[in-house]
């Protein structure tokens, strides 16, 4: 039996007691530190109990809670689309009407923020990409958005119920959580395989015919509703004739009959500037097949298929000792180790997604909505950055809390830890090399520019440093369609090269992105900042348990301020502090990436094209020359772009000016926590408490300055 019935009583009285999960915190506050510890430890299930089964159940229950919150959030997005948006007006004229789903109430003149977005609608322009996603899904009216919003709330309720049910009524036993083969099969075949198949089915039966009609200029009110396509095959055959043949071509393996709705064209739809939706339907069907096969690969009840333990233990090379022996035990008993790997993979994938959003814009009219393109790129870069740093955080927690050196001898993990000095010192050298050389190229250019010697600068018009390997990769992909798949008419992305340019309503959706000296320079800044981030995070993981400075670090835990009194120079060495510093460098990395993307696209891709074919880019193609100096970045990018926001007061853009101001206030607030020491605040607090005592209004809970760790946490959060 894999389920335990009624393991934990449902008690509202217990839940109402703050800190009920911890013996110490349940006693209540003596100082204000209590409230911070409450926040820090509420979800640190390791600190509640040592029982791995109970910890696993809590994590499992929390996942349902997380899903419920996501459903509520999604419901809100869809509800705004239904109640406060100009979706239907946008749908009928997406090139002139801007998307808006937020209206500011007219309290003391705030209606100035509601600009005219077109279609007779006043509101704040949104940049989330939901309109484009809804159009691609085949949503044609606001009632459908209402229904989806209600459906999402119902699902949120189900998720909350499931979270309670699987912790309090029928909780899985530890063996269920550790049955990795079954979990792999179900997640691969069910979640990814059937999930992709369901989406492919929706695309084929609902989205494709609706989008085909919309592309042809049919009014959204005239388009048949989704159920009409599903119930009436005649309407479908008008859009895609092969539907008349039913499933006969499928079972006779004559699959090419379906090539009217399952295509492999490449490039973009010239009407919408998005990927061909017939390509994406084909893609999801193919992905579904792959994952359905993958979901039958692992050995469970019938003695056939792969065993994860066998794969890991066989994974050893001539120079790697015991290889991955012992890793199976780690990954089935340490959820931190499991999470670290998943976060690293998902973080990398999210960053890849951010690049696909502009190189292969997946939804109709997304590529010509520049503000949304910028927002989606930024969003996915940031999320990816957080996930990668989170991977290092949980890897370090694993090292401190879950790693048992006695069971890991001479396997890959042990060997990496034993030669950590070589790894970190080499990585440090790489960072120094990249930092001095990449920055040095810019300093050289600034100096030559200041001295009036443009011929001695590194640029496309003087001393060229062309990214030849990147150009070779681009060229290979640009030439691929002719020699790879039979029906591929264009490259996977038109950014690779060639002469194709897609414009929608005179606005450029995509064009080849040529790389030159300016990109070569900033690329090495990317390499530098990313390597420094990795250096800090990896050092935190590899030295989480011990170092020459603090040999017994593992005993001090994941986060600690210093190695006790009398040991000066041992502050800020905990694994937590490495995550803290790693976050700052992750921010550094992403800032440069977003600057590069934003300027490059405005300079070389985005803009307008006249009927005569004359192209006008937003910043007039100034990236290649201006971005080769630090001064160019400051003057022609940062100031040139920020000045519009700073001067936006009194117009409907002032919301962005206020956000810009507010963001800088939040940032300055963070520095207050990072630049002043704990003792400063403790001294100040005690003086204020003295004054309260004089007036006999002193609180029972003794006020106390934030600990060093807490102060830095507040600081990094607001940075």
Curated annotation (Swiss-Prot):
One GO location term (cellular component): photosystem I
Reactions catalysed, as given in the entry: reduced [plastocyanin] + hnu + oxidized [2Fe-2S]-[ferredoxin] = oxidized [plastocyanin] + reduced [2Fe-2S]-[ferredoxin]
GO MF, one annotated term: metal ion binding
PROSITE patterns xrefs: PHOTOSYSTEM_I_PSAAB
Binding site for chlorophyll a': 664
One example of a Gene Ontology biological process annotation: photosynthesis
Pfam families to which the protein is assigned, alphabetical: PsaA_PsaB
Residues holding [4Fe-4S] cluster: 562, 571
EC number per UniProt: 1.97.1.12
Binding site for phylloquinone: 681
Co-factor binding details: P700 is a chlorophyll a/chlorophyll a' dimer, A0 is one or more chlorophyll a, A1 is one or both phylloquinones and FX is a shared 4Fe-4S iron-sulfur center.
Mode of membrane association: Multi-pass membrane protein
TM ranges: 59-82, 145-168, 184-208, 280-298, 335-358, 374-400, 422-444, 520-538, 578-599, 653-675, 713-719
List of residues binding chlorophyll a: 672, 680
Role, per record: PsaA and PsaB bind P700, the primary electron donor of photosystem I (PSI), as well as the electron acceptors A0, A1 and FX. PSI is a plastocyanin-ferredoxin oxidoreductase, converting photonic excitation into a charge separation, which transfers an electron from the donor P700 chlorophyll pair to the spectroscopically characterized acceptors A0, A1, FX, FA and FB in turn. Oxidized P700 is reduced on the lumenal side of the thylakoid membrane by plastocyanin.
Family of this protein: Belongs to the PsaA/PsaB family.
Protein name: Photosystem I P700 chlorophyll a apoprotein A1
